[in-house]
Amino acid sequence: GYSSAASDVYKRQSIIDGVRLCKAKRYRYANANMEELEKCLQEAQAQRFRIICTDGVFSMDGNVAPMDKICDLAEKYDALVMVDESHSAGVVGATGHGVSELCKTYGRVDIYTGTLGKAFGGALGGFTTGRKEIIDMLRQSSRPYLFSNSLAPSIIGASLEVFKMLKEDNSIHDRLVENVNYFRDKMMAAGFDIKPTQSAICAVMLYDAPLSQRYANRLLEEGIYVTGFYYPVVPKGEARIRVQLSAGHTREQLDKAIAAFVKVGKELGVLK
């Protein structure tokens, strides 16, 4: 075999499509499970090239990939590392510089991908960055890039301004962290089952699929827009409401959302 890709089972759909397009031999490991990743890399030694593909922050749970351990294994088994920073860039790390800042893996990751549709202004489009040789090759041979329209100048301009703001001022990022901690702590104190998070994603676990949809619909009636996820988007029996916090949320808005969660929770028997 020529190449192989080992990827986390909770990876984004874009990584799934990318692995399919590159026709590499596929290996999958359980979410953030380094023992399984090591077994995948051992099996992949027969291939000439190996790449580990992971999200920086996993979109359904909000947990962070252990990038330092992933990079250690990549060096041990001579593999490239690709991380999708869509949910982590602008959010994770002391200054919002993503999982490489949080895990101190600058210079150890070969390819970064990300989106302009989340922390960087909520527009559309995305980016890939890495060593010049890799980017030059992608410019010439990446079909999704080659045969897509260019982004509008207004989107590029706005996104560059967001990059500049994040680099010069940490106050927006600090406000986001405060909001996430406040919402999570208040929700847990109210009795909700919240997944541990180091990101702006807060997963309120309900486990029952129909309940997650009824809950989301009732919250919308209360003026709170959230999404209920269930199988096949998440594993069976792992239905949840995903809440994404923003630096733009005021304390009053967060209190309104928490009050609505509690009210509906009591109505539907989630809270006693």
Question: Predicted segments — roles?
Answer:
Residues S14-K23:
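Active-site-proximal loop->helix
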Residues Y77-L80, H87, V92-Q198, L211:
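Active-site C-terminal subdomain of aminotransferase-like
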Residues Y27-V83:
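Active-site phosphate-binding strand-loop segment of PLP-dependent enzymes
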Residues C22, K76-Y77, A190, E222, ...:
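Helix C-cap/helix->beta junction micro-motif
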Residues D174-F183, M188-G223, V233, G237-E238, ...:
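Conserved PLP-binding catalytic core of the aspartate aminotransferase-like
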Residues G1-A6, Y10:
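Single conserved hydrophobic/aromatic residue that forms the stacking wall/gate
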Residues E221-I224, P232-K272:
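PLP-dependent enzyme catalytic core of the Aspartate aminotransferase-like
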